C-alpha cells in the first residue's frame, strides 16, 4: 500500500480497475490491465547472481533485507507512467480519471509528459506491507470472521501500522547487455514472499481454520462434502 497524507491506496496488486467495479475476471479489466501494465511490483529470482551483472547500480544498492526493493529502469534510464503514479510522482487522480473515461467509452484525455526525475525522487520511497489475513476481524456475536477491507477507518489504521517496504536502489541495464532478465519495475526479494507466508500461517484466522478444518471460519458453517 502507498500511504500519503493520511490516505492509503493498494498498489500491489494494483486496484485501479477494481475501484470502478471491475473484477479481476472481467474481460474489460483484463484488457485494460494488459494495455496499461498496472502492476509494477515484481519478485526477483532468488539467485541474484543470475542477473545482477547485467545492470549498473545508479543509486543505492541491491536489496539486502527482506523489506528492501530496487527500481529497474528501462535501457534509456526511464520509468513507466504507471510507476510514476505508484511512486506518487504524478497525481493518482489523473490516472483514475483516464480509466473512468475509458470505461465510460469517452475520449480519454492522455497528455504525454516527459517529466524528468532525479534519483533522489525515487530513492527511499516507502510503502506499507499489509497481510491479507489482517483484513478480517473476528465477530464474537456470530463467531465468524468478517472482511473489513471496505471499512476505511479499519484499513487506514491497518495500513498505517503496516511494515515499511523501502526502495533502496536504482539499477539500469548495462549498455552492452543484449538481453536482461528483469523488465522495468519495482522488485522485491523472494524472501519477502516467504516472510508473508510465514506471517499468514501464524495469523489467528489461519490458525483457527487449520484447527477446525471441517468448519468454514467465514460463515461459521460446516464445509459441504
Question: What feature does the model see in each segment?
Answer:
Residues 1-225:
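Basic-flanked hydrophobic alpha-helices used for secretion and membrane insertion
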Amino acid at each position: 500500500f502507498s500511504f500519503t497524507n493520511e490516505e492509503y491506496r493498494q498498489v500491489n496488486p494494483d486496484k485501479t480497475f477494481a475501484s470502478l467495479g471491475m473484477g479481476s475476471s472481467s474481460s474489460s479489466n483484463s484488457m485494460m490491465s494488459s494495455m496499461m501494465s498496472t502492476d509494477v511490483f515484481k519478485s526477483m529470482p532468488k539467485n541474484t547472481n543470475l542477473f545482477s551483472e547485467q545492470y549498473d547500480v545508479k543509486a543505492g544498492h541491491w536489496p539486502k533485507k527482506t523489506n528492501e526493493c530496487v527500481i529497474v529502469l528501462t535501457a534509456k534510464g526511464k520509468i513507466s507512467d504507471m510507476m510514476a503514479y505508484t511512486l506518487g510522482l504524478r497525481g493518482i487522480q489523473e490516472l483514475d480519471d483516464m480509466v473512468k473515461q475509458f470505461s465510460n467509452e469517452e475520449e480519454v484525455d492522455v497528455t504525454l509528459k516527459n517529466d524528468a526525475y532525479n534519483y533522489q525522487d525515487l530513492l527511499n520511497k516507502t510503502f506499507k506491507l499489509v497481510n491479507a489475513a489482517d483484513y478480517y476481524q473476528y465477530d464474537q456475536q456470530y463467531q465468524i470472521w468478517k472482511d473489513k477491507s471496505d471499512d476505511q477507518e479499519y484499513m487506514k489504521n491497518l495500513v498505517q501500522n503496516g511494515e515499511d517496504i523501502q526502495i533502496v536502489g536504482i539499477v539500469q541495464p548495462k549498455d552492452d547487455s543484449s538481453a536482461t532478465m528483469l523488465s522495468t519495475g519495482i522488485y522485491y526479494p523472494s524472501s519477502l514472499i516467504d516472510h508473508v507466508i510465514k506471517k499468514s500461517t501464524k495469523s489467528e484466522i489461519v490458525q483457527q481454520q487449520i484447527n477446525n478444518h471441517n468448519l468454514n471460519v467465514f460463515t461459521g458453517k460446516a464445509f459441504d462434502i
